[in-house]
Amino acid sequence: MSTKYYSGIRNKKKNAKIGEELSFASKEAYNLLRTNISFAFPDQAGGRVLGVSSACPQEGKSTTAINLAYSLADADNKVLLIDADMRRPSVCFTLELEMSPGLSNMLAGNKDVNINKGKLLEKLDIITSGDIPPNPSELIGSQKMKDFLDDCRKKYDYVIVDLPPVLSVADTLALSKYIDGVVIIVRHNNAKRRDVVETIRQLEFANAKVVGFVYNKIESKGVARYYKPTKYYKKTQ
């Protein structure tokens, strides 16, 4: 593994731009991502479960997951956003929600999961990570997690799952067999090519469907008003 990924609560304040806080160009970029995601599953019955991950930390995956979920809900889809990064949860801090009870508490059988409704949009529900467990990979790859996602498919058009970085811990690979696809976030001037290639290799070895890539944090110098800070690239076979 190329990057250490420690368990622990992040002591940070909300600083990401979310939903209506985004610039026009950023909103359009997420709308384009939303459209491409819909094309990735044209004939699938039931709700789609899509993971958002990266090769390494600090690529912007959590912010992308939140804004993708927002964009999908804004287009009149019923959407559930799940923070499944149990080691370094981010969604609760970004959206100023209580961390627990959340996903880990439900999977461990301690409490019912708390679904946050209407925080951003009426059609967007949010489940936070819950308390940091001693065994995240076991919980996230469990039969109980599969059953939970199968139930979510019946209630939502899309389930967006914020996942840990692939090369840091085994959690994303453990969950990959239960979801329909993974979008990989690649931050400009941050991710190394070899790490992205290794991420794809590991996901494909786990029989995960890599739907595409989001190239994030592109510099706007010299770019006119049509500049988009996020670009989507569909994976080609």
Regions found by a protein language model. Give the residues of each.
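C-terminal lobe/tail of nucleotide-utilizing enzymes
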Residues: 1-31, 36-37, 194-237
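P-loop/Walker-type NTP enzyme "switch/lid" segment
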Residues: 6-31, 35, 42-46, 54-58, ...
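Primarily NTPase-proximal linker/entry elements flanking Walker-type ATP/GTP-binding cores
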Residues: 38-49, 70-74
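Hydrophobic positions on the alpha1 helix immediately C-terminal to the Walker A/P-loop
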Residues: 63-64, 68
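Conserved nucleotide-binding/hydrolysis micro-motifs of P-loop NTPases
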Residues: 86-88, 112, 131-134, 166-167, ...
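Inter-motif core of Ras-like GTPase G domains
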Residues: 151-154, 168-189
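Hydrophobic residues in beta-strands of the RecA-like P-loop NTPase core, especially within AAA+ ATPase
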Residues: 160-161, 215
